[in-house]
């Protein structure tokens, strides 16, 4: 289910505050955040945001085609280690 249009998009207030403070600077440092639920706004373009995946912060460079998506969509939380291998030593034909 999508979010109601009446409510509008959500972004963590502390993240918005950090973006606005760094907007005029030429050097843009990496912004660390735990807010995977925040929607990417057009003002985020050009920033690198390190999103927490439960273990570490993964840097994500924000581009214009990411606007409208959530930060958590670009950082997977689960590591796929592969399926169990087949035993070729089974007795058979």
UniProtKB/Swiss-Prot annotation:
Pfam families: Ribosomal_S19. NCBIfam families: rpsS_bact (TIGR01050). HAMAP family: Ribosomal_uS19. PROSITE patterns: RIBOSOMAL_S19. One of its GO terms (molecular function) is rRNA binding. One of its GO terms (cellular component) is cytoplasm. It comes from Oenococcus oeni (strain ATCC BAA-331 / PSU-1). This is Small ribosomal subunit protein uS19. Coiled coil: none annotated. Protein S19 forms a complex with S13 that binds strongly to the 16S ribosomal RNA.
């Amino acid at each position: 289910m999508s979010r109601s249009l009446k409510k509008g998009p959500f972004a963590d207030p502390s993240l918005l505050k950090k973006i606005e403070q760094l907007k005029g600077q030429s050097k843009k440092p990496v912004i660390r955040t735990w807010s995977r639920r925040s929607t990417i706004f057009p003002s985020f373009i050009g920033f690198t945001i390190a999103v927490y995946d439960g273990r570490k912060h993964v840097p994500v460079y924000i581009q214009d085609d990411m606007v409208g998506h959530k930060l958590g969509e670009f950082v997977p939380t689960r590591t796929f280690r592969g399926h169990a291998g087949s035993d070729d030593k089974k007795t058979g034909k």
